[in-house]
């Protein structure tokens, strides 16, 4: 095996051929598909008389379009029903496992693959979804692809790629109480910008990263793409192995021991050189909330909307647009901004640990009058585990709606949508204009615990001012 960074090693292990122009044909170890970006890809295969090359390396689920209130078939939305039926037919014809509704394994694609043990160190993972970088939390190289590339991977189990540079995001120290991985990644994106990572893979390292749980690492890598990086990863360690052991698709017995030895060898060598390194101090990071229309427009909870004079010249045009769209003036404290809708869920923050953190704030409190609040577990497994712990009751008693799994209001390709000029506190990953349904709806990104704090006060609130209530 070559020496160097994990990225270098995984790249070399999966190289099929060097192509003219400097790109490389890479073997794809795991291909994840869903109902939105796969129909045209399958049609493209049929048009060329091709079949799926490696159905055993292809895994499907339905997530983007599924309703979260009632998942009875047929869906009320005929387009959603058609998309799901098409996925079912394509998977059946191609011999692809579909983790469908009611299977006990359905959910957001970037939630179910890790919980099933499909995402493993040293893999290359591809999916027709921007947030495929999530799987880098395991020490994999994972990247989102477009529909035409989905077709190519279905046909050849490989993909033409240009090799990225590696930037180490070194985070020293420890996060303070009340500060989460979501706050950390929003802080990184705010600092480096939404285009700062273009051309890079982000290697997250340092004592603060090592202290994160696997689900927190998934949150971190999930949003690497929002900082412009094509992928983000964390070197595998004991935390990785403890998470994977015993999961359905993880190795077992002697194969487990051999896998762990190999996974450890993939980690970036101590003497390996990276192309760039940026150092952060975890101790100074506060709960972070976006104020604008990109994930890079973030603020610590004690800060105010910046004036143009505080911004670099290149940031000013988008800031002007954000002032108008968000109806927030320079100098407005982010704490205290009123909220209409509160959403907990998504591939960023819809896992069991996210729901536990949110429930600790919600327990014994009530959603403010006039605020609509709901919780959408990231998968059927997450939902059933949360219900077994009574978290659904905690949320329901606090005034949150408890829903069934799906992407929900992260992108509103389903009935969960903002209306008019509503403003949401959301644990999702994108705050683009119109992202959550309404063309004029507004989104403030924050951690699940911060969403609950906003819900109970009806405005953006520092969760650190609220006492946490553990289960009795």
UniProtKB/Swiss-Prot annotation:
Its cofactor is [4Fe-4S] cluster. It comes from Synechococcus sp. (strain CC9902). Its EC number is 4.2.1.33. The gene is leuC. This is 3-isopropylmalate dehydratase large subunit. Catalyzes the isomerization between 2-isopropylmalate and 3-isopropylmalate, via the formation of 2-isopropylmaleate. Heterodimer of LeuC and LeuD. Keywords: 4Fe-4S, Amino-acid biosynthesis, Branched-chain amino acid biosynthesis, Iron, Iron-sulfur, Leucine biosynthesis, Lyase, Metal-binding. GO terms for molecular function: 3-isopropylmalate dehydratase activity; 4 iron, 4 sulfur cluster binding; metal ion binding. Pathway: Amino-acid biosynthesis; L-leucine biosynthesis; L-leucine from 3-methyl-2-oxobutanoate: step 2/4.
